[in-house]
A protein has these predicted regions:
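C-terminal catalytic domains of large/alpha subunits in multi-subunit enzymes
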Residues: 1-237
């Protein structure tokens, strides 16, 4: 199933979809009991009853009938899902950076990230995931360092007072967008997003800084080689 944190929409979403499909089938069976002797069919979330009575019920009306009719009961759908494939999401990241030679300093100006996560179930949630992942990638590239005592092997970076991460004012102008596609294995065509947002950010930052400065970079964080200038903070779009 891939990384489990990234696969919640893909794995759980498919399980929920199967449970809903099972629920709709059980609603058909319940309506057959209520409308004894009639034929019941479901199509496009509407229920068609023919035979003794000719009725067309919306999903809401069908649910109400099943719940409150003396012959009805509470239908419960169930679904389980084991991934048959792990579809790959894709991302591309662009970074604009400045290099000030006299100060040996860098400033991030803009970050643009575009992703293919299939059909987004909730575009606002996906955008938030991307923005958070970009911030994590900025911290990884510029500041973050896990310090370990070479003798005791104990972690020295034990709190956020001494472990540098980006604040809101440290973030450059950030733009995110989604290219919609349809994955045949995902719930309603969706794929995972998760760590996808973080992965390309540090390489893009390093490439931008290398091209601006002409300095070869083989290690992170960049604060070991350069001073980090405040960003010209803009709105996230």
């Amino acid at each position: 199933t891939g990384t489990f944190g990234s696969s919640q929409t893909f794995i759980c979403g498919n399980a929920v979809k199967l449970a809903c499909d099972d629920l709709k089938k059980k609603m058909v069976e319940q309506l057959k009991v209520i409308y004894d002797g009639c034929t019941v069919k479901e199509k496009d979330h509407r229920y068609y009853i023919s035979g003794g009575e000719e009725l067309e019920l919306s999903f809401k009306d069908a649910a109400r009938k099943i719940l409150f009719d003396p012959k009805g009961s509470v239908p419960i759908g169930a679904g389980t899902y084991k991934a048959l494939a792990c579809p790959n999401p894709f991302s591309v990241c662009f970074v604009k950076a400045e290099y000030h030679k006299k100060l040996n300093a860098i400033r991030l100006m803009d970050i643009i990230e575009v992703v293919d996560v299939g059909t987004p179930i909730n575009r606002l949630t996906v955008a938030g995931q991307l923005e958070g992942g970009i911030a994590q990638g900025v911290g990884y590239a510029l500041y973050e360092r896990m310090e370990i005592n070479p003798r005791s092997r104990r972690t020295l970076s034990t709190d956020f007072l001494h472990y540098r991460i980006p604040q809101m004012g440290d973030m450059p102008r950030t733009y995110v967008d989604m290219v919609s596609s349809h994955d045949p294995y995902g719930p309603h065509g969706a794929k995972s997003v998760g760590e996808l947002a973080t992965v390309p950010v540090a390489p893009a930052i390093v490439n931008a800084v290398r091209r601006a400065s002409g300095i070869e970079i083989n290690s992170l964080p960049l604060c070991d080689k350069f001073a980090i200038l405040p960003t010209e903070r803009g709105n996230v779009k």
